């Protein structure tokens, strides 16, 4: 450890050398019963999360990601079905479906979402036990995340790429701290950190920007080690690990660089913005301008559990200032602070903005709470505990009413969303095969058809998202789509290859072209009552006569 004189602040190289990180007697080492209670509370929270994930209604975004996993081995990911994100989520789902069977796709996706939560809990507990020497602080960290309403909606409850990167980012952070927060850096841990961080970024392109603070830190820490040693033992292994973890994205990019950019970058700019500009929703206006994004960020970050996290952070900073004689800034604090700031910055990148885009800084803010608390001396911790207890109580009051009611769903597994959707898909498939044979089903809501093992059109493989934006895809980029279709060309496509059935009613006005074709060609409408699906009140199955 780098020594420091009273009244001066210097950068320390190892958290564990500081008195605040030594094992101590009470109150820093709580009685065993308190630790058991904290672990029991975390387990109960995990069970409640499982119940909410299993019973949360199917969302539109899941039509995109689940279908990509199901069709991964049937069509090219980008040029075939028009996937517009980095490939890791499709690879994960495809691998899980291949391993666990070709049915109950949505249920498997939800189980993976729950696994991401368990991985996140494990990463937070590891960080807490290593850098704050306490189970209770780990329980608080888990509460700040799991009881935050921003994660108890589509963001954390569904099979999408919104939450899946979080455990990988936190484990990557933990491995980096363990690799460099020592007198002799560990190349193996640095490699592992780079690998896991690259895997996280492969789920969501915006997370690539979160790698920048790690790259800078790899050149600067540990500060007591010569630059050459930092390059060889931290920066180089981190880079090599990143290349290894990022291979799926790298290989796709090298295979067709222009097509990769067209799908990953351009599809989110011109086409999507073009669609929303042409179809404004006065009831639910989309957030596009920076002013509107700032207002949305204000509403999300300065309310609820996110606000409580910020209050706790500011309180710990104030205590650190009061105890500045024994408090020294440490590079892990600076790194995690930079990650939280970068996470806040990337929240403003996508357009239009949705609430799930404003969650990236929150896990790092929670880790920062842990590191700040761990940096305090014993009197400083005594000052912090009442504030932390109050924040914990308010967090439970805020989040528990959203989380706990789902527990009743555990008693009826047959009503879980993934099970219900698979059952409805099988019923739809039985009707189609009985009346119209094994022809393809035309639908912008493909999960039910895929759950019933019905063939679908690759043009509609990812649901409504690409079809509705297709008119704004530049002519020069349409060659990157093997099955390109716009709402205006749907009739000619279906005339050339008539569908055995048409399923509509979950995608609003985007279904209009399919419904018009079904009515014009005399398909027989069959009203359906689909449960556990978003916007499924007026579903129609049109059967060929």
PLM region spans:
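Membrane-interface alpha helices of multi-pass inner-membrane proteins
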Residues: 142, 187-205, 211-216, 243, ...
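Transmembrane-helix motifs of polytopic, lipid-linked glycan transferases
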Residues: 42-43, 111-132, 147, 152, ...
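Membrane-lumen/periplasm interface segments of specific transmembrane helices
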Residues: 234-279, 345, 349, 448
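Short periplasmic/luminal acceptor-recognition loop of GT-C membrane glycosyltransferases, typified by
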Residues: 84, 195, 206-208, 304, ...
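Extracytoplasmic catalytic/substrate-binding loops of multi-pass membrane glycan-assembly enzymes
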Residues: 54-68, 80-95, 103-107, 257, ...
């Amino acid at each position: 450890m780098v020594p420091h004189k009273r009244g001066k602040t210097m950068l320390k190289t190892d958290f564990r050398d500081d008195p605040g990180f030594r094992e101590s007697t009470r109150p820093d080492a709580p009685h065993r019963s308190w630790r058991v209670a904290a672990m029991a509370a975390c387990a109960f929270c995990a069970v409640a999360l499982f119940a909410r994930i299993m019973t949360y209604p199917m969302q539109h975004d899941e039509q995109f990601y689940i279908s990509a996993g199901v069709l991964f081995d049937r069509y090219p990911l980008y040029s075939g079905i028009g996937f517009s994100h980095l490939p890791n989520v499709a690879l994960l789902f495809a691998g899980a479906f291949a391993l666990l069977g070709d049915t109950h796709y949505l249920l498997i996706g939800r189980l993976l979402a729950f696994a991401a939560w368990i991985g996140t809990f494990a990463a937070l507990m590891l960080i807490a036990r290593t850098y704050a020497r306490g189970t209770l602080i780990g329980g608080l960290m888990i509460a700040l995340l799991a009881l935050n309403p921003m994660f108890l909606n589509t963001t954390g409850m569904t099979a999408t790429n919104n939450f899946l990167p979080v455990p990988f980012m936190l484990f990557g952070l933990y491995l980096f701290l363990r690799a460099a927060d020592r007198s002799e850096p560990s190349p193996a841990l640095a490699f592992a950190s780079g690998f896991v961080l690259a895997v996280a970024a492969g789920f969501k392109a915006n997370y690539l920007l979160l790698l920048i603070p790690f790259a800078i830190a790899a050149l600067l820490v540990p500060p007591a080690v010569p630059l050459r040693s930092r390059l060889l033992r931290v920066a180089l292994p981190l880079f090599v690990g990143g290349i290894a973890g990022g291979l799926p994205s790298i290989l796709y990019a090298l295979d067709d660089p222009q097509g990769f950019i067209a799908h990953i970058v351009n599809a989110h700019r011109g086409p999507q913005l073009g669609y929303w500009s042409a179809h404004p929703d006065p009831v639910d206006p989309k957030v596009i301008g920076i002013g509107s994004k700032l207002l949305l960020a204000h509403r999300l970050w300065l309310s609820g559990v996110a606000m409580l996290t910020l209050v706790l952070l500011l309180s710990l900073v104030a205590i650190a200032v009061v105890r500045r004689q024994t408090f020294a800034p440490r590079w892990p604090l600076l790194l995690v602070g930079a990650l939280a700031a970068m996470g806040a910055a990337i929240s403003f990148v996508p357009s239009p903005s949705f609430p799930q885009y404003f969650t990236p800084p929150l896990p790092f803010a929670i880790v920062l709470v842990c590191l700040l608390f761990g940096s305090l001396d014993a009197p400083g911790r005594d000052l912090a505990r009442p504030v932390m207890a109050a924040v914990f109580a308010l967090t439970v009051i805020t989040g528990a009413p959203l989380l706990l009611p789902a527990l009743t769903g555990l008693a009826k597994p047959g009503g879980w969303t993934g099970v219900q959707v698979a059952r409805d898909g099988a019923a739809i498939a039985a009707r189609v095969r009985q009346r119209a044979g094994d022809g393809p089903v035309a639908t912008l809501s493909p999960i039910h058809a895929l759950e019933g093992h019905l063939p679908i059109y690759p043009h509609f493989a990812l649901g409504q998202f690409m079809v509705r934006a297709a008119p704004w895809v530049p002519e020069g980029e349409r060659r990157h789509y093997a099955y390109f279709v716009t709402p205006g060309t749907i009739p000619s496509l279906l005339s050339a290859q008539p569908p055995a059935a048409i399923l509509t009613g979950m995608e609003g006005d985007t279904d209009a072209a399919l419904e018009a074709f079904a009515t014009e060609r005399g398909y027989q409408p069959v009203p359906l009552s689909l449960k556990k699906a978003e916007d499924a009140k007026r579903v129609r199955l049109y059967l060929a006569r």
